[in-house]
Amino acid sequence: MGRMWLETDQDRRPFTFIRARFSDGDGSATSKYLPRNHLPLPAQAWLDRGIKQGHVGTGEMQFHGRLRDIRALNREMAGEFFVDFSIDRAEVFFAPGWQPASNGSGRVLFHNVSMDIDLDRVSYDQIDNGRARVTIADFENPSLDLRIEAGSSTALAVSTWLETPVGKQYRRVMSNLGSFDGAVSTEVNLSMPLRGPDPEPDVRVLVNFENASARSESWGLDLSQVNGGMEVTADGIRARKIAARYFNDPIEIDIDTPGRGANTRVSARGRIETRQLLNKLPSSLTRDLDGKSDWRLRLDIAGLSTPPDKPLLRLNATSNLRNTAIGIPLPFAKPAPAALQVTADVDFFEEQIWFNSKVGDSIRTRGQLVADDERDFTLNLLDVAFASELKSKTRRRLNIYGSIAEISIDDWLQYLEDSGAADPDLLGSVEL
């Protein structure tokens, strides 16, 4: 149903006005009602597959201007062409590798050589109640711009992100995390030229955590009350000053990926209970640590270019151990106010964890935790060297060796007995 009006000027150049209303249409047939001869082929291809399905409720088409090429009318501002309609149950495709948005409800507007799809309700993968906007500003030089805003639980956000092209590289690492809680709000911005055979989208995802949390039993990690924002692109992740709690201690987190395929570095700092950083060791070896110290943590997450025989995660931790009392006999013992510089490096593999540490100037440690069939890690070896270097050869169980000026054998025997470290299953050798 509509109206049409046609007139000519004194030079017999036609000027027309067309207005039509329509309803109960097929949203996937959108491009059939547009001036296809004036659209570049990549733009036509996207329109043919972009709106994959949908029900058109009501709409209107209007044209007024000279009967000329719409692109010329647009450049000369000598006429206008509109197609405006409501749509529901829409499914909109964006780019290869990305899931289409589904169950969309909103409006579609074509104005001269531009397009605007505004969906005030849309689902993306498992996330519902999102909002999306898709625009092509100029069909003569077409580029697709997309923005999706959505909120969901942390668990849904993580599982959805890992299925996207910008999240797949983190699947191995994230498979070790679970018990997700809290909420996440997300804004996906995608821009893709609609020219050339294989256009690559430029993606920028803004993520805001709202009291999110995650745990890793195998790695001894417990993060809670995570609040703050980060940016995810095809090149990696960036974030500044994310607030969180490591177990119950407040920390601040920065994240940076220097380039595509490179390791992602997570830096954290805070006053942390020292014993918690060693929670994967037998409690008999950590029970005499008491207090919280300022720690700086640097965590490198394996990137796409990391060889498979390298660790998934590499942790470096440093502290002066002020405010942590050590009840282990000399030369480890120290009161809480005293300083003792400690540096530790920990490598996380799928089935094992290796660690090395330097305590003060003359103590070195090395250890290995191995996973059983239930993915529980237990101590396989621990070397404690009172020396500037560790022996190259490793032996199972607890091995103490090196040179020390003074040591109380009675104190150590009593400590080993009280802690259970003297158990034959744990104690391997003592060479002092």
Identify the meaning behind each predicted range.
Residues 1-118, 122-124, 128-355, 368-432:
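Membrane-proximal interfacial segments on either side of biological membranes
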